[in-house]
Swiss-Prot record:
Binds 2 Zn(2+) ions. It comes from Saccharolobus islandicus (strain M.14.25 / Kamchatka #1) (Sulfolobus islandicus). Zn(2+) 2 binds at residues 65-66, 201, 257. This is Ribonuclease Z. Its cofactor is Zn(2+). The gene is rnz. CDD domains: RNaseZ_ZiPD-like_MBL-fold. Homodimer.
Length: 291
């Protein structure tokens, strides 16, 4: 199970309804923050989302609406006496930006900060992919590893209830049971891992389409409603995002990075769903659960 909290779904500058980009992804105790617009630390703390529980932060690019909240988040972690290593992914300039800011503000983190290009553990991977914006930018693909599970329905039909047999089958061992040899390949099924992709700011481009194919959730730049000039500014409009979702055969599309010029987004959803019916437009502080 993966939960995605939409902390900030706006763009450029905050509005009454939408804060700046920030998304918290949770999976069984692992907390990943994607982008960190101004005010993110307040949103995390005010909603008891555990600022110090964040293990990994991924920044898509160096525009202020995506990164100006990062210093505050890290400073608050220090004030809360964090000890655990914080892992950060981001553009090449991010490290210099942070450490120069630390130097001028006389801040010395009480914990280790490690800059990484990707992340892997026994349950999940985080990879970057190329996006197409006006500055160096990258998206993030969070993937659960596939898991092997016992076909409990088949075991029940065959009235096999011995947990020792189940354990050996899961270990890939052939088991003799009631005069019959049970082969693991006959009783094991692969549960496909969930995948979540976040583009940050981007025009619709082939590198994004190829990287997000088949994901369970695509969080895509949808800055404008229908302006054909969106690409001129390195952004997508709603139809662009929906076409990417359709071509990439994703399961669900979340429209985000909504320009503050729009108070009513009813038309955004109508436009998106004409092209890609499984589209949503989350409000700030909404969340979804993928299973």
């Amino acid at each position: 199970m993966i939960q995605i909290f939409f902390l900030g779904t706006g763009a450029g500058s905050p509005s009454k309804k939408r804060k700046l980009p920030a998304f918290l992804v949770r999976r069984e105790g692992l907390n990943i923050l994607l982008d960190c617009g101004e005010g993110t630390q307040y949103t995390l703390m005010n909603n008891k989302l555990g600022i110090n529980s964040i293990k990994i932060i991924g920044i898509t690019h160096m525009h202020g609406d995506h990164v100006f909240g990062l210093l505050g988040v890290i400073a608050s972690m220090g004030l809360l006496d964090r000890k655990e290593t914080l892992y950060i992914l981001g553009p090449r300039d991010l490290k210099d930006f942070l450490y120069t800011s630390f130097e001028y503000s006389k801040f010395n983190p009480s914990f280790k900060i490690e800059f990484i290009d990707n992340y892997n553990d026994q349950n999940i991977t985080i990879a970057t992919f190329k996006t197409c914006h006006t500055v160096e930018s990258q998206g993030y693909l969070i993937s659960e590893r596939d898991r092997v599970k016992i076909d409990e329905e088949k075991l029940e039909k065959e009235k096999i209830k011995d947990w020792r047999v189940m354990r050996k089958l899961k270990e890939g061992k052939t088991v003799e049971y009631n005069g019959k040899f049970l082969k693991p390949e006959d009783y094991l099924v692969i549960k496909r891992g969930l995948k979540v992709a976040y583009t940050g700011d981007t025009i619709p481009c082939q590198s994004v389409i190829e990287s997000v194919k088949g994901v369970d959730l695509l969080i895509h730049d949808s800055t404008f409603l229908n302006e054909p000039s969106a690409c001129t500014y390195g952004h997508s409009n709603v139809a662009d995002a929906a076409k990417v979702a359709l071509e990439a055969s994703v399961k669900l599309l979340a429209l985000t990075h909504i320009s503050p010029r729009y108070e009513d987004v009813t038309e955004h959803l109508k436009v998106a769903r004409r092209i890609f019916p499984k589209s949503i437009l989350p409000d700030d502080l909404s969340y979804i659960t993928l299973k």
